[in-house]
């Protein structure tokens, strides 16, 4: 831990992410026959969750720990700018979480957030690390959880089968790629259709440059707003390294189009030997089943130049609203402390795949991440530079490079700086919403905002029925003007996928029953705010002390025909939730290539100039 403390004290450059979780709801309907009626009014706390990972065991942990709280969980867009959108409508959640984080972006929220600088919670962090979250006036609004590690995942078993040496530096990494290409196996692939991959690989292959004295000096200037341009001294070598990486590995237009799952599926089939991934990916995609996989660093010119790339799993903050009440202030701080204490971080680092940032937290590493230990001791963990514009522009420029639209490092640097100097896209007004809908859940009407979105998706998709977790609609639907960017904030997009399939009525019963009963899953229901919304059919559900039970499904008041077949759209998490319910329904394939929620909202408001479909009373909660 002393070595780890040294590591934490060295991380003065932190700028990263956030996440959230939830809890149990209180007065949400008549209790079931076997349940205890709830007469005591609970304190409502709204928690904005950065991703559906929080719907796993983490939200249930908070529900169990604070039974006196009526938690409302929403899946927020993973951006500090989302909270700017909420602040514009005077509708900030009580507890905020975000993974994509930079002080450069977060400073715009400073006046809306609670100052944590003098709290016991802030005192549990190493002082030098806390400096990274401290403004010039001493204010601290955000605190990090544990660190996600993001580097190269390799299939050691595949290396052994083909007698390819495990890489130790950049030259041996390239040699390994060439050896696998010679036998028809991709040496290295990655999901360059994702902005985070473009940004992380661009930075990852040049960490020694970015960690140099010149690199750290430039980053301080950028984070403070003193410059909005990439330094040629620092960044031209970065682009030179990426061009070399691209050319020697053989990356091109096909790689630019790879979505998140493609490299992982190839890795699972033994079709590629290495890909960019996280500690969580080591658990979820362990090669061909029995393969030994390792999380390796970004390789430098020498072994001493190797680094791992990291970022906080998420940051937490609290809204100012209501914090002038001492009792509520204490409750919010107690919840935040539980989110980042040992027990809370154990629920985040469920697979022993993360590194703690706090003095009072110890997290074990799984064997696949043993390589990381000496890098922790040597303080060789780089924290990615993760401002909103870094994500956006890194993707734009890396895609240009992979598609041969820019052919030299100088052109790439110029293209990046041109984008930095330009206006952010998507900020002009493109739509007007006429009618306000609340996303508060009531047992009589459900979540009306989520119902309006689900009904609109059903109409535009042409499918018979739609089923989606209501918390994917992240806030009230406010009446007024919207930019394209703000339209996207209505519904969670990066974690939600449309699953298109044909289901019998009997399979739909299985789907709903499985969904209500599942635990430890990114589609799990932990309270009323995380229940699902249905479009085209209604659900009769009983709430008990142990959860939720399905009584009946109806269409227009008549029982759903179990023998009939319906075109069906599930909107939710793809890899964990959909795979589990599909197995229960006996379905092996699902089409997830359709539009996401933002696409349907754009079609409705921008392309058609329309409005949302009216909500329906889709649930009876007993």
Q: What are these regions, as identified by a protein language model?
A:
Residues 6, 21-103, 121, 166, ...:
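Conserved N-terminal structural module of periplasmic/extracytoplasmic solute-binding proteins
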Residues 72, 310, 349-422:
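C-terminal capping/gating helix-and-loop segments adjacent to ligand/active sites or protein-protein/ligand interfaces
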Residues 85, 93-94, 122-157, 186-191, ...:
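A structural signal for short loop-to-beta-strand junctions that line the ligand-binding cleft
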Residues 99-151, 165, 174, 200-201, ...:
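Hinge/lid segment of periplasmic solute-binding proteins
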Residues 141-145, 174-227, 272:
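Extracytoplasmic/periplasmic solute-binding protein
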Residues 222-256:
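Glycine-centered hinge/linker elements that transmit conformational signals in sensory
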Residues 287-350:
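Extracytoplasmic/periplasmic substrate-recognition and gating elements
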Residues 447, 451-622:
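Feature captures C-terminal
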